[in-house]
Design a protein with these regions (language model features):
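Juxtamembrane transmembrane-helix termini in multi-pass membrane transport proteins
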Residues: 2-75, 135-153, 157
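Cytosolic-biased juxtamembrane loops and peripheral soluble domains of multi-pass membrane proteins
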Residues: 93-122, 173, 178-180
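Selective transmembrane alpha-helices of multi-pass membrane proteins
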Residues: 70-100, 157, 161-167, 179-208
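Core segments of transmembrane alpha-helices
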Residues: 122-135, 192-196
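Alpha-helical transmembrane segments and their lipid-water interface positions
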Residues: 26, 52-63, 85-91, 130, ...
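Short alpha-helical transmembrane interface motifs in multi-pass membrane proteins
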Residues: 10-15, 83-86, 117-121, 152, ...
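Hydrophobic/aromatic residues within the transmembrane alpha-helices of Major Facilitator Superfamily
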Residues: 17, 21, 54, 90, ...
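Juxtamembrane cytosolic amphipathic helices that cap and anchor the N-termini
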Residues: 7-8, 110-115, 127
């Protein structure tokens, strides 16, 4: 087992899962989409977010810390992320009250490609994801961890992110939950938009 799992694996897994419970930009993006489009219209977001997390984990493994030496590049990523969050949030805050087609099996939803790209962009343009994985893996795993052990931890964390997000959007897409949310959907979307814009504005203010 030690060949694949480092001694601090349980600590890393616990810290990672606890961090998932703390709502961030990805969480509010998922809630905003799942509340209206259900699982069919938001599953691609989960895949995109997981893919973005996977890329950052790979970068950490191969030497993400080197990028920190190029301050201008990291600042550019932060600015891009802030503007992206503001853009997503601006669309959600314009949500208007309207009834959900709860019994309509062919309710129009974003294409799978659009969902994946939106989720991928949300994950990649949030530098905190990179810093989180960098801090988590370097602090908990230590300098003696092997490449195979790092890869095992990386696969585990990506699968946990994907599973958690799918569970979240599945719950939001249940008919019983949808019926309770129907009248307040526009308010949920607007709230999610305000939160996303808040994240973007905070990053923009901190960087500038």
């Amino acid at each position: 087992m030690e060949l694949f799992f480092p001694s601090a694996f349980l600590a890393l897994a616990l810290a990672h899962f606890v961090a998932l419970l703390s709502p961030g930009p990805d969480f509010f993006l998922l809630v905003g989409y799942a509340a209206r489009y259900r699982l069919r219209g938001s599953a691609g977001l989960c895949v995109g977010i997981a893919a973005g997390n996977a890329l950052y984990i790979v970068l950490v493994i191969i030497g993400w810390s080197a990028l920190r030496q190029f301050g201008w590049l990291f600042t550019l990523i932060e600015l891009s992320g802030a503007l992206y969050l503001l853009w997503i949030g601006s669309h959600l805050v314009r949500s208007q009250p309207q009834a959900l087609a709860l019994n309509e099996p062919r309710q129009r939803c974003p294409s799978l490609r659009k969902q994946i790209l939106l989720g991928l962009g949300s994950a990649l343009l949030n530098p905190k994801n990179a810093l989180f994985y960098l801090a988590l893996m370097t602090a908990l795993l230590g300098p003696d961890v092997t490449l195979l052990q790092q890869a095992t931890c990386g696969v585990w964390m990506v699968m946990v992110v994907l599973t958690w997000d799918l569970v979240l959007v599945s719950l939001m897409g249940l008919s019983s939950v949808q019926q309770k949310l129907s009248r307040a959907l526009w308010l949920i979307e607007r709230t999610a938009g305000v939160v996303l814009m808040g994240f973007g504005g905070w990053v923009l203010w901190r960087v500038i």
